[in-house]
């Protein structure tokens, strides 16, 4: 899980979602998981 100021999809499988007001990227590749912090 990467915590960064701007989250962007890295590959075509990445999905940008909102969870409890936080923007997150979820993906099949665990290295692509991101959270806005």
UniProtKB/Swiss-Prot annotation:
Matches recorded under PROSITE patterns: RIBOSOMAL_L36
GO cellular component, one term: ribosome
Gene Ontology MF, one: structural constituent of ribosome
Keywords tagged on the record: Ribonucleoprotein, Ribosomal protein
GO biological process, one term: translation
Superkingdom, taxonomy of origin: Bacteria
Cross-referenced SUPFAM superfamilies: Ribosomal protein L36
Family affiliation: Belongs to the bacterial ribosomal protein bL36 family.
Cross-referenced NCBIfam families: rpmJ_bact
HAMAP family: Ribosomal_bL36 (MF_00251)
Name of the molecule in the record: Large ribosomal subunit protein bL36
Species of the source: Bacillus cereus (strain ATCC 14579 / DSM 31 / CCUG 7414 / JCM 2152 / NBRC 15305 / NCIMB 9373 / NCTC 2599 / NRRL B-3711)
Organism ancestry: Bacteria, Bacillati, Bacillota, Bacilli, Bacillales
């Amino acid at each position: 899980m990467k915590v960064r100021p701007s989250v962007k999809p890295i590959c075509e499988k990445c999905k940008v979602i909102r969870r409890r007001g936080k923007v997150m990227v979820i993906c099949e590749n665990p290295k692509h998981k991101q959270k806005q912090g």
